[in-house]
Design a protein with these regions (language model features):
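Two-component/phosphorelay signaling modules centered on CheY-like receiver
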Residues: 9-29, 33, 43
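C-terminal output helix
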Residues: 85, 103-113
Protein backbone atom coordinates (compact mmCIF):
# COMPACT_ATOMS: atom_id res chain seq x y z
CA UNK A 1 0.00 0.00 0.00
CA UNK A 2 1.35 3.39 -1.08
CA UNK A 3 0.84 6.19 1.45
CA UNK A 4 1.17 9.97 1.11
CA UNK A 5 2.16 11.88 4.26
CA UNK A 6 1.34 15.59 4.56
CA UNK A 7 2.76 17.20 7.69
CA UNK A 8 4.48 20.57 8.08
CA UNK A 9 6.67 19.46 11.01
CA UNK A 10 9.72 17.59 9.74
CA UNK A 11 10.26 15.47 12.87
CA UNK A 12 6.66 14.23 12.81
CA UNK A 13 6.92 13.44 9.09
CA UNK A 14 10.04 11.39 9.79
CA UNK A 15 8.37 9.58 12.71
CA UNK A 16 5.34 8.77 10.56
CA UNK A 17 7.55 7.50 7.73
CA UNK A 18 9.49 5.29 10.15
CA UNK A 19 6.32 3.83 11.70
CA UNK A 20 4.76 3.15 8.31
CA UNK A 21 7.85 1.60 6.74
CA UNK A 22 8.40 -0.56 9.82
CA UNK A 23 4.82 -1.84 9.35
CA UNK A 24 5.55 -2.67 5.70
CA UNK A 25 3.89 0.30 3.99
CA UNK A 26 5.44 2.21 1.09
CA UNK A 27 5.59 5.95 1.75
CA UNK A 28 5.35 7.23 -1.82
CA UNK A 29 5.70 10.94 -0.95
CA UNK A 30 5.90 13.55 1.79
CA UNK A 31 4.29 17.00 1.58
CA UNK A 32 5.06 20.02 3.75
CA UNK A 33 1.75 21.81 3.10
CA UNK A 34 -1.77 21.17 1.87
CA UNK A 35 -1.23 22.44 -1.68
CA UNK A 36 1.73 20.13 -2.16
CA UNK A 37 -0.37 17.24 -0.79
CA UNK A 38 -3.10 17.85 -3.38
CA UNK A 39 -0.54 18.03 -6.20
CA UNK A 40 1.27 14.87 -5.07
CA UNK A 41 -2.01 12.98 -4.64
CA UNK A 42 -2.99 13.95 -8.18
CA UNK A 43 0.30 12.89 -9.77
CA UNK A 44 1.27 9.85 -7.65
CA UNK A 45 -2.22 8.42 -6.94
CA UNK A 46 -1.48 7.00 -3.46
CA UNK A 47 -3.69 4.33 -1.90
CA UNK A 48 -4.12 6.31 1.33
CA UNK A 49 -3.17 9.72 2.71
CA UNK A 50 -2.24 10.88 6.20
CA UNK A 51 -2.83 14.63 6.51
CA UNK A 52 -2.12 17.08 9.30
CA UNK A 53 -5.00 19.51 9.90
CA UNK A 54 -3.09 22.77 10.37
CA UNK A 55 -0.56 23.27 7.58
CA UNK A 56 0.64 26.28 5.58
CA UNK A 57 -0.97 27.37 2.30
CA UNK A 58 -3.95 25.00 2.58
CA UNK A 59 -5.21 23.24 5.69
CA UNK A 60 -5.42 19.46 5.74
CA UNK A 61 -9.22 19.36 5.76
CA UNK A 62 -9.51 21.44 2.60
CA UNK A 63 -6.68 19.41 1.05
CA UNK A 64 -8.64 16.23 1.88
CA UNK A 65 -11.76 17.67 0.25
CA UNK A 66 -9.85 18.51 -2.94
CA UNK A 67 -8.11 15.13 -3.07
CA UNK A 68 -11.40 13.29 -2.61
CA UNK A 69 -13.09 15.33 -5.35
CA UNK A 70 -10.54 14.01 -7.83
CA UNK A 71 -9.93 10.50 -6.55
CA UNK A 72 -11.64 8.82 -3.63
CA UNK A 73 -9.01 7.32 -1.33
CA UNK A 74 -9.06 6.71 2.42
CA UNK A 75 -7.73 9.72 4.31
CA UNK A 76 -6.74 9.82 7.97
CA UNK A 77 -6.16 13.15 9.69
CA UNK A 78 -3.23 13.25 12.12
CA UNK A 79 -3.30 16.38 14.24
CA UNK A 80 -2.70 17.96 17.62
CA UNK A 81 -6.19 19.49 17.48
CA UNK A 82 -9.16 17.51 18.74
CA UNK A 83 -11.80 20.25 18.80
CA UNK A 84 -15.28 19.09 17.83
CA UNK A 85 -15.54 21.73 15.08
CA UNK A 86 -12.41 20.42 13.34
CA UNK A 87 -13.54 16.80 13.66
CA UNK A 88 -16.93 17.78 12.22
CA UNK A 89 -15.30 19.59 9.27
CA UNK A 90 -13.09 16.56 8.62
CA UNK A 91 -16.08 14.21 8.61
CA UNK A 92 -17.97 16.54 6.25
CA UNK A 93 -14.93 16.57 3.94
CA UNK A 94 -15.11 12.77 3.75
CA UNK A 95 -12.12 11.62 5.78
CA UNK A 96 -12.19 8.13 7.26
CA UNK A 97 -10.11 8.63 10.40
CA UNK A 98 -8.97 11.28 12.86
CA UNK A 99 -5.97 10.71 15.16
CA UNK A 100 -4.97 13.24 17.81
CA UNK A 101 -1.24 13.63 18.50
CA UNK A 102 0.68 12.38 20.29
CA UNK A 103 -0.11 8.84 19.20
CA UNK A 104 1.77 5.57 19.00
CA UNK A 105 2.18 3.04 16.23
CA UNK A 106 -0.42 0.95 18.08
CA UNK A 107 -2.90 3.81 17.44
CA UNK A 108 -1.88 4.58 13.85
CA UNK A 109 -2.03 1.09 12.36
CA UNK A 110 -5.61 0.32 13.48
CA UNK A 111 -6.69 3.77 12.23
CA UNK A 112 -5.24 2.94 8.80
CA UNK A 113 -6.85 -0.52 8.77
CA UNK A 114 -10.23 0.94 9.76
CA UNK A 115 -10.01 3.69 7.14
CA UNK A 116 -9.18 1.13 4.44
CA UNK A 117 -12.04 -1.15 5.49
CA UNK A 118 -14.57 1.70 5.61
CA UNK A 119 -13.38 2.95 2.21
CA UNK A 120 -13.72 -0.53 0.65
CA UNK A 121 -17.18 -0.98 2.18
CA UNK A 122 -18.32 2.39 0.85
CA UNK A 123 -16.93 1.58 -2.61
CA UNK A 124 -18.82 -1.75 -2.60
CA UNK A 125 -22.04 0.01 -1.56
CA UNK A 126 -21.63 2.60 -4.31
CA UNK A 127 -21.00 -0.14 -6.86
CA UNK A 128 -24.09 -2.04 -5.71
CA UNK A 129 -26.19 1.14 -5.79
CA UNK A 130 -24.98 1.88 -9.34
CA UNK A 131 -25.80 -1.68 -10.40
CA UNK A 132 -29.27 -1.48 -8.85
CA UNK A 133 -29.92 1.91 -10.43
CA UNK A 134 -28.94 0.52 -13.82
CA UNK A 135 -31.10 -2.59 -13.33
CA UNK A 136 -34.06 -0.48 -12.23
CA UNK A 137 -33.63 1.75 -15.26
CA UNK A 138 -33.57 -1.28 -17.55
CA UNK A 139 -36.65 -2.71 -15.83
CA UNK A 140 -38.53 0.57 -16.19
CA UNK A 141 -37.53 0.84 -19.85
CA UNK A 142 -38.64 -2.73 -20.53
CA UNK A 143 -41.96 -2.25 -18.74
CA UNK A 144 -42.68 0.89 -20.74
CA UNK A 145 -41.81 -0.80 -24.00
CA UNK A 146 -43.89 -3.91 -23.31
CA UNK A 147 -47.08 -3.10 -21.40
CA UNK A 148 -47.87 -5.70 -18.80
CA UNK A 149 -44.33 -7.12 -18.98
CA UNK A 150 -42.78 -7.87 -15.61
CA UNK A 151 -39.40 -9.15 -14.54
CA UNK A 152 -38.45 -11.00 -11.41
CA UNK A 153 -35.53 -9.51 -9.50
CA UNK A 154 -33.63 -10.94 -6.59
CA UNK A 155 -32.23 -8.21 -4.37
CA UNK A 156 -29.76 -8.42 -1.54
CA UNK A 157 -30.70 -6.98 1.83
CA UNK A 158 -28.62 -3.88 1.00
CA UNK A 159 -30.42 -3.55 -2.31
CA UNK A 160 -33.82 -3.49 -0.65
CA UNK A 161 -32.60 -0.79 1.73
CA UNK A 162 -31.35 1.32 -1.19
CA UNK A 163 -34.71 1.14 -2.93
Amino acid sequence: MRILIAEDETIIRLDLREMLEKAGFDVCAEAKDGEEAVTLARTLEPDLALLDVKMPKLDGIEAARRILEERPIPIVMVTAYGEAELVSRAVEAGVFGYLVKPFRESDLLPAIATARARHEELAALREEADSLTEALGQWRSASWLEPGHTREWTLTWRGTKLL
